[in-house]
Amino acid sequence: MEKLQQLDLMDKILRELDDLKNSQTSVLKKLAQIEADNINLGVALLDDKLPDIHTEVDSSIEIMGTLVEEFQQHRDNFYTKNNLVAVQDPTA
């Protein structure tokens, strides 16, 4: 695989990771809404299980955020190491 193809694939993966993180954030918001609704409803099953799920999803978002940052750094290092600025913009 050529260097530019690798860079394009890394950029695609970064977009997908960011999309996944956004999806997880949406899940967390929905969980919070269910937890709030259950305050009025008072179902013990939900009281017992939802906080654990909330914690797991929140932890997953943090892990995903770290992964995105680390992979972005990997991508940037690859870009610099392979001098791809000269290939992408020959006037540079």
Name these PLM-found stretches:
Residues G42-I63:
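Short, glycine/alanine-rich amphipathic alpha-helical segment
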Residues N38-G42, L67-A92:
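Long amphipathic alpha-helical coiled-coil segments
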Residues M1-L9:
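Short, charge-rich amphipathic alpha-helices with coiled-coil/heptad character
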Residues Q24, E56-H74:
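Amphipathic alpha-helical coiled-coil segments
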Residues Q5-Q6, Q24, Q33, Q72-Q73, ...:
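Residue-identity detector for glutamine
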Residues D8-K21:
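Short, charge/polar-rich alpha-helical segments
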Residues L14-L17, L28, M64, R75:
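Generic N-terminal initiation segments characterized by hydrophobic and/or small/turn-forming residues
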Residues D18-N40, K49:
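Amphipathic alpha-helical interaction modules
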